[in-house]
């Protein structure tokens, strides 16, 4: 029986060429797998037909938009996950769902190997292969760009020689990855980290310098998940899409950062994540009134570690699973409404309410009706500062000897 290889297929030049390239290099039949995570553009049927036209013996396509929003974006939101304080894990959280469908397709079509289009310098090769090793430990992995010397120039020449049904061009200097959670742009002139990004970089966001009138929005949450916008019920996918539209129109969610890649290099990235950043901002403000102080402090540490694990391709790891359990427990009271104004690149919260809020007006007010017993403060301060006072006395005593 001829060996079969499952290929993560985007519909673009590199993976279209990879179908024939892999076949010629290995003698195997190629099954193309395309997963819709809200990246937009062409329909899955168009992509499926292109894969078959480029030589795939089968084409597996999956509309995973709701799955991605529910099972991958929402855990990211609950964790308030921002890698190195900036990046909302746009690409990192899409790789596990693609891996899941790659392994599923491999089982369905009897493939023994999974192929992806990643280079040897990026994070995604790790995310794909660690995920595949975890979900399908018997499966082998290959990367045509990395392992079979498939360069961009060779891809264009191969496509033209074979007459493949795909546009061949070098005109776009950027590497772009996008889904409903956001958009990532790198390479080209951006590799000089002194160069400012030009307007053509952006697609999800309008120029924040010339915004339309301020847009006030009320986002309702239930156990950490957005369930309504301005009183209209929404699914997680619909919430992200609506805020992509409204926050994007105000230029919210533009991120220009140099980050530490898993492979040991620093890389300049431009991200657009209007919906993600608006939701994370709103969610964090709701947590501020519904999560107890010590729990909130520790959750911030957990969220940072969670983001690092996911960035580093450890979505399916035991530690990440344990952190998920902690984060999920913190969300039981994160229900209520957040009012925010979207304008000029900013998402500013100006109101919050919750039936499970820990904010007590009578304790917090400085006006008549204050129920806070200030007489307790003196004793509390004495006890709170006791250890520092004792240590200071020791320091003075030793210094005087």
UniProtKB/Swiss-Prot annotation:
Keywords: Amino-acid biosynthesis, Arginine biosynthesis, ATP-binding, Cytoplasm, Ligase, Nucleotide-binding. ATP binds at residues 8-16, 117. Its EC number is 6.3.4.5. Its main location: cytoplasm. It is found in: Cytoplasm. It is an enzyme of class 6 (ligase). It catalyses: L-citrulline + L-aspartate + ATP = 2-(N(omega)-L-arginino)succinate + AMP + diphosphate + H(+). CDD domains: ASS (cd01999). L-aspartate binds at residues 119, 123-124. InterPro entries: Arginosuc_syn_C (IPR048268), Arginosuc_syn_N (IPR048267), Arginosuc_synth (IPR001518), Arginosuc_synth_CS (IPR018223), Arginosuc_synth_type_1_subfam (IPR023434), AS_cat/multimer_dom_body (IPR024074), Rossmann-like_a/b/a_fold (IPR014729). Pfam families: Arginosuc_syn_C, Arginosuc_synth. One of its GO terms (molecular function) is ATP binding. Pathway: Amino-acid biosynthesis; L-arginine biosynthesis; L-arginine from L-ornithine and carbamoyl phosphate: step 2/3. Homotetramer. Belongs to the argininosuccinate synthase family. Type 1 subfamily. PANTHER family: ARGININOSUCCINATE SYNTHASE. This is Argininosuccinate synthase. It comes from Paenarthrobacter aurescens (strain TC1). The gene is argG.
């Amino acid at each position: 029986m001829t060996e079969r290889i499952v290929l993560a297929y985007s519909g673009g030049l590199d993976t279209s060429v990879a179908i024939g390239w892999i076949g010629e290099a290995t003698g195997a039949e190629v099954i193309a797998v395309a997963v819709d995570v809200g990246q937009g553009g062409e329909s899955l049927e168009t992509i499926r037909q292109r894969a078959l036209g480029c030589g795939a013996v089968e084409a597996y396509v999956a509309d995973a938009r709701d799955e991605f929003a529910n099972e991958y974006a929402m855990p990211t939101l609950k964790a308030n996950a921002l890698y190195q304080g900036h990046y909302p894990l746009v690409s990192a959280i899409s790789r596990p769902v693609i891996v899941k469908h790659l392994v599923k397709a491999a089982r369905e079509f009897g493939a023994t190997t999974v192929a992806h289009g990643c280079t040897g310098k990026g994070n995604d090769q790790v995310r794909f292969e660690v995920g595949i090793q975890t979900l399908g430990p018997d499966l082998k992995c290959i990367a045509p760009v990395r392992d079979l010397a498939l360069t961009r120039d060779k891809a264009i020449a191969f496509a033209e020689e074979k007459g493949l049904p795909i546009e061949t061009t070098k005109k776009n200097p950027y590497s772009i990855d996008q889904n409903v959670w956001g958009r990532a742009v790198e390479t080209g002139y951006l590799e000089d980290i002194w160069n400012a990004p030009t307007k053509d970089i952006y697609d999800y966001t309008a120029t924040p310098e010339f915004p339309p009138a301020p847009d006030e929005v009320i986002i309702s949450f239930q156990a950490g998940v957005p369930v309504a916008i301005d009183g209209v019920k929404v699914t997680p996918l619909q919430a992200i899409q609506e805020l992509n539209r409204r926050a994007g129109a105000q230029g919210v969610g533009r991120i220009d950062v140099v980050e530490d890649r898993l492979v040991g290099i620093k890389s300049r990235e431009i991200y657009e994540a209007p919906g993600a950043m608006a939701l994370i901002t709103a969610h964090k403000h709701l947590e501020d009134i519904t999560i107890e102080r010590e729990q909130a402090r520790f959750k911030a540490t957990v969220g940072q570690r969670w983001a690092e694990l996911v960035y580093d391709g450890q979505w399916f790891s035991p530690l990440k699973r344990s952190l998920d359990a902690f984060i999920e427990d913190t969300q039981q009271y994160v229900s209520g409404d957040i009012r925010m104004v979207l304008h000029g690149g900013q998402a500013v919260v100006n109101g919050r309410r919750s039936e499970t809020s820990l904010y007590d007006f009578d304790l917090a007010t400085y006006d008549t009706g204050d129920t806070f017993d200030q007489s307790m403060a003196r004793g509390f301060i004495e006890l709170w500062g006791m250890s520092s006072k004792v240590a200071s006395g020791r320091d003075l005593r030793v210094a005087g000897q």
